Amino acid sequence: MSAIVDIIAREIIDSRGNPTVEVDVLLESGVIGRAAVPSGASTGTKEAVELRDGDAARYLGKGVLQAVENVNTEITEAIIGLDVEEQSFIDQTLIDLDGTENKSRLGANAILAVSMACARAAAEESGLPLYRYLGGSGFMQLPTPMMNIINGGAHAENSVDMQEFMIIPAGLPTFREALRAGAEVFHALKKILHSEGLATTVGDEGGFAPDLPSNEAAIQYILQAITAAGYEPGRDILLGLDCASSEFYKDGLYHLESEGLQLTSAQFADYLATWVDKYPIVSIEDGMSEHDWDGWKLLTDRIGKKVQLVGDDLFVTNAKILREGIQKGVGNSVLIKVNQIGTLTETFTTIETAKRAGYTAVISHRSGETEDTTIADISVATNALQIKTGSLSRSERIAKYNQLLRIEEELGDATSYAGKEAFYNLK
């Protein structure tokens, strides 16, 4: 048994300059596990609750001292002495201690930081890399990355309605080569935007945030950059979108302000289907609002056999909501964000629920990130085959990519790169 002897929480700063929670879990052996939690900008209404202090005199009300206090007192008392290797028991203890459906009493940020730090301590104690500790000794594949190189919506101050335009280097032979392709396209795009007098400042996730005449213009610039970097769109590099449609869904209509359009669910499904026919788009996240299940069903029936339709705000990493979506034939993929649900055990349950139903699972960062690389290990440990962790700039994004490079190197011939196999449920 590897007993927990102390837990120390602190308030640190995330990539947006906002406070977040970091936790150290100390074991009897002297081993320490450390983890820090992320925070989102566009959030689903059913996400687990991130506890903020609301004190306007500190960090504009975004302090997390109460969450830190909850860890250092109540949570510590509840799990000191427990075996750190009993992850599911620890997580259930935290859930029961909180006692609410959405972790609003103690805070999902407090609970998740402890859950992740316990896993890190247990891995260290076992002498295993985190991905091996979490995933066992079986065959593991490196995930195909979805790289957000043009930011819009809630992630940027610009005229683009949709939140993310991504490149997916699925046609490359290794993760290392996929990462290189992504970086080369990123630099080619910067050069193109600069030559046209467009801004090359970056958004929260490290992608460029230029003012463009339309949402479609973002796709066209990216295709130009792929070609300029010496790659072939559709063969080497595919495209992905995160519409974050809940952000512009009002009164039953989709308001694309940059184009002066107000579309019904059926019209917006047509709009997206036209793009899918025209461009090598393989993945669309939150193509409809979380409040528009009928629209989701319409979109799934329309293009769900040839495009990955990822539920983020829709499913909020919640196995119960995902099961409802599976039953109703809504979407064919789930985005996995550890802080939407609040423990590692519940995160893994959602991933398994997706896989059993033939849905894909995409491991994801948040727009407010830290240097914590746990999600990189989770993507390999669970054989999720896809990861979404930002652009090719900003260290909090690159930290995850660099961890995946290390994992690929460690596994050597005992691994392969998922590539286009990541989209196993498409025809």
Curated annotation (Swiss-Prot):
Species in which this protein is naturally found: Methylobacillus flagellatus (strain ATCC 51484 / DSM 6875 / VKM B-1610 / KT)
SUPFAM superfamilies, alphabetized: Enolase C-terminal domain-like, Enolase N-terminal domain-like
CDD domains: enolase
Disulphide bridges, residue numbers: none
Keyword Magnesium: yes
Entry keywords, A to Z: Cytoplasm, Glycolysis, Lyase, Magnesium, Metal-binding, Secreted
Protein name (Swiss-Prot/TrEMBL): Enolase
Cited SMART domains: Enolase_C, Enolase_N
Binding residues annotated for (2R)-2-phosphoglycerate, in chain numbering: Q163, K337, R366, S367, K388
Binding site for Mg(2+): D242, E285, D312
Pathway listed: Carbohydrate degradation; glycolysis; pyruvate from D-glyceraldehyde 3-phosphate: step 4/5
GO CC, alphabetical: cell surface; extracellular region; phosphopyruvate hydratase complex
Cofactor binding note from Swiss-Prot or TrEMBL: Binds a second Mg(2+) ion via substrate during catalysis.
InterPro entries registered for this protein in UniProt: Enolase, Enolase-like_C_sf, Enolase-like_N, Enolase_C, Enolase_CS, Enolase_N
GO molecular function terms attached to this record: magnesium ion binding; phosphopyruvate hydratase activity
Broad class of where this protein is predominantly found: cytoplasm
Metal-binding is among the record's keywords: yes
GO biological process: one example: glycolytic process
E.C. number(s) listed in UniProt: 4.2.1.11
Localization terms from the record: Cytoplasm; Secreted; Cell surface
Function of the molecule: Catalyzes the reversible conversion of 2-phosphoglycerate (2-PG) into phosphoenolpyruvate (PEP). It is essential for the degradation of carbohydrates via glycolysis.
Residue numbers annotated as active site: E205, K337
UniProt superkingdom: Bacteria
